[in-house]
Amino acid sequence: MPPPNVNRMARYLAILFTLGAGLVGCSEAPDTPSPASPTAQPPAPTTAQLSPGGAQPRLAADPVRLAQDLIADERALRDASTPEAVLKQAARRQQVAYRAIGRHPEWDAIIRPVLPAELIPFYDRNVDARRQLAKLAEPRDTLPAWRINPPPPAQALLTAYRDAEAASGVGWNYLAAINLIETHFGSVTGDSAAGAQGPMQFMPSTFAAYGKGGDIHSPRDSILAAGNYLAANGFAHNPDHALFRYNNADAYVRAVTDYAAAMAADPAAFGVFYRWDVYYVTTAGDVLLPVGYAAESPIPVGEYLTAHPQ
């Protein structure tokens, strides 16, 4: 049995995102439909920008109003006529809304009943994923020594996921979900405390065994290696076991399953997640790390927030 690829970036972090922080679990994970082709228009390439500063989108304080705004954003994200700039802003607000709802289970009885039926599965999977990731988050008093770059083009990622699926039998949506949680599709550049590297956060020794001579920092090579690793750990017969071997946390397994199910069922989901921001969980709350963020060493969170108010 291959050695588990543990102590990935999310452990060190307290991150992300999708994330906002972390990783996931296994109780009553939703059934995942057969992977559907992501037919929505792939997002336009992301361009680096530090202004308007990475300030977080503002949400309504009232959960009823928040629900109304979330419905409007969800509909815009599924409307083929929505301009890219509007899609980006809707996705950013949606992400922050799910992060807030994840922290407030008392809002469930207010928000969920007013959602249109067609949005409930996507809502449920996102809220559950957030709560699972929160179990793995350890708020830090410093921001990480990372760089945040634009992710690779969406179509290049989708091609890599599909090629890995064809080679390994592991669903493209599971590979995309792991890529989302680990490094926001490769936006995050930085090693974990344990030494995990690259867009799929492999330990070098594990990548050497499953990467077939590829480059651990290559998005395509690391995605293909992840498919090989999961297949070798019995993904075809027991996906939960294989995902647990990838990162030894039940909450991680459940979050990956949630995001994978969302992408399999909803053609808009991948584009939505691709447009999300990178967040880091700190003792001062969630901090948005914009494209262009770069630190050679950890930065005290208070110092960063003074210069970059959220």
Model region roles, listed by residue range:
Residues 2-13:
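Bacterial N-terminal signal peptides that target proteins for export
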Residues 12, 43-49, 53:
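Intrinsic disorder/low-complexity detector
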Residues 13-19:
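Sec-dependent N-terminal signal peptides
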Residues 23-25:
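C-terminal motif of bacterial Sec signal peptides marking the signal peptidase cleavage site
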Residues 27-47:
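Short, low-complexity, disordered segments immediately C-terminal to signal peptides
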Residues 29, 50, 54-158:
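N-terminal export signals and maturation junctions of secreted/periplasmic proteins
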Residues 106-290, 306:
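Catalytic glycan-binding domains that act on GlcNAc-containing polysaccharides
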Residues 295-310:
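Extended, helix-rich structural scaffolds rather than catalytic motifs
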